[in-house]
Amino acid sequence: GVGFKAGVKDYRLTHYTPDYETKDTDILAAFRMTPQPGVPAAEAGAAVAAESSTGTWTTVWTDGLTSLDRYKGRCYEIEPVPGEENQFIAYVAYPPDLSEEGSVTNMFTSIVGNVFGFKALRALRLEDSRIPPAYSKTFMGPPHGIQVERDKLNKYGRPLLGCTIKPKLGLSAKNYGRAVYECLRGGLDFTKDDENVNSQPFMRWRDRFLFVAEALFKSQAETGEIKGHYSNATAGTCEEMLKRAVFARELGVPIVMHDYLTGGFTANTSLAFYCWDNGLLLHIHRAMHAVIDRQKNHGIHFRVLAKALRMSSGDHIHSGTVVGKLEGERDITLGFVDLLRDDYIEKDRSRGIYFTQDWVSMPGVLPVASGGIHVWHMPALTEIFGDDSVLQFGGGTLGHPWGNAPGAVANRVAPEACVQARNEGRDLAREGNETIREAAKWSP
């Protein structure tokens, strides 16, 4: 007789294991799935586990040459989503051997590579993942981390302040450098290349880096503070990207920048290793994230992309602002902000955290609040993000009616006033605007 029966097999038989006890070394994932009508939840969950690990749609001879029990993904729990008719959270455990060490690229190729186009599912979203220390320890993590960055910059006890230079496209390198100088001279810690600024015909990267470095050193000499500009090293090839990072280091600037989703995890980690070896801070922008994380029932939640960045490496990452959005968003945003900054984060479903995450000793990433913020948001931002964050303005600096430098002064005075008021025990939610009005009287 033949060894096994051909034909399409039920995934449930092998990949749905409700009695499985998860191991400390397992990579865990929580998927929000919307099965097609008529597909049972257990079958859909098992299909997700199978297709993102060892399974295929039929039994194959070569299955006998390995131990599937050791390598297969297991759907170990399914819970209906309250208030949704046909939605479930499927919990899947993967053995760590399925992912190459130190490769976010390979981890994602496994867990979210194929399965999102799966016919039996109407939609699928990766809501959260648990990275075990056994696996996270194979990653370098951020090149410096929060504490080392503060030590390098000699800035303590307050959020760091930045400003994206606008108009983002069209300025010449010389004028761009001038805007950088005015902002830094006014009191900001950092200025930033917009994520779209790479090396376009109106401003080639080398010219921009040079004029920006000049602005940095001039403003440093005049203020006695350490200044930085996120020079965007993102490029069309890894070699070109590293060439730009090398040039930045040769100029003696403290920080470079990368778009980690459009540039890709592989390029990002290569750049991070260079930064680690050469003492450069690495600022990460998340251009393209909304393509992946904006849909509520399909895609990947940003908290997973944030965890992936902490492993792939970066010292700063953009993480939304909360301000002016809904209250519910606040807890969710703070959930992944803590996943970026802290060592140990407890499971807390109200903040969207499905698993307890222990980063052990991996350095933290500074969350960057950017997008439409200005001085009147300061009390709220100080309260929400605390000291370990970067507050990133744009129009909120350069839109000041008196010019860029006064805009930067205002940006610096407001958070310092808020931090002082908070430290004196005043309630920022109630007295914040008053605090800023008071401070403005003494601001030049």
From Swiss-Prot:
Keyword Chloroplast carried by entry: yes
Keywords: Calvin cycle, Carbon dioxide fixation, Chloroplast, Disulfide bond, Lyase, Magnesium, Metal-binding, Methylation, Monooxygenase, Oxidoreductase, Photorespiration, Photosynthesis, Plastid
EC numbers, comma separated: 4.1.1.39
UniProt-annotated binding residues for substrate: 114, 164, 168, 286, 318, 370
Cofactor mode of binding and number, as noted: Binds 1 Mg(2+) ion per subunit.
Matches recorded under Pfam families: RuBisCO_large (PF00016), RuBisCO_large_N (PF02788)
Record-listed N6,N6,N6-trimethyllysine modification sites: 5
TM spans (from-to): none
Active site: 166, 285
Subcellular location(s) per record: Plastid, Chloroplast
Residues given in the record as Mg(2+) binding sites: 192, 194-195
Subunit: Heterohexadecamer of 8 large chains and 8 small chains; disulfide-linked. The disulfide link is formed within the large subunit homodimers.
Note: The basic functional RuBisCO is composed of a large chain homodimer in a 'head-to-tail' conformation. In form I RuBisCO this homodimer is arranged in a barrel-like tetramer with the small subunits forming a tetrameric 'cap' on each end of the 'barrel'.
The protein, known as: Ribulose bisphosphate carboxylase large chain
Source organism (scientific name): Botrychium strictum (Fern)
Higher taxonomy: Eukaryota, Viridiplantae, Streptophyta, Embryophyta, Tracheophyta
Gene transcribed to yield this protein: rbcL
